[in-house]
Amino acid sequence: MFTLKIVVYTTVTLFVSLFTFGFLSNDASRNPNRKDLE
């Protein structure tokens, strides 16, 4: 049961991190004022 909880938490954390990184990257690319990310 403890192992299952660890796996679930790891998966959720990874998913949230990827979603946040993707959202920030897309938001920065849509913003014409951010030329330093190229």
Curated annotation (Swiss-Prot):
* Localization per Swiss-Prot or TrEMBL: Plastid, Chloroplast thylakoid membrane
Alphabetical keyword list: Chloroplast, Membrane, Photosynthesis, Photosystem II, Plastid, Reaction center, Thylakoid, Transmembrane, Transmembrane helix
Q: Which cysteines are joined by disulfide bonds?
A: none
Coarsely, its chief localization is plastid
Membrane topology listed for this record = Single-pass membrane protein
Q: What are the GO BP annotations of this UniProt entry? A: photosynthesis
InterPro entries tied to this protein: PSII_PsbI, PSII_PsbI_sf
One GO cellular component term noted in the UniProt record for this chain: chloroplast thylakoid membrane
Where does the chain cross the membrane?
A: 6-25
NCBIfam families cross-referenced by the UniProt entry: PRK02655.1
Q: Which family does it belong to?
A: Belongs to the PsbI family.
Q: What is this protein called?
A: Photosystem II reaction center protein I
Taxonomic lineage of this organism?
Eukaryota, Cryptophyceae, Pyrenomonadales, Pyrenomonadaceae, Rhodomonas
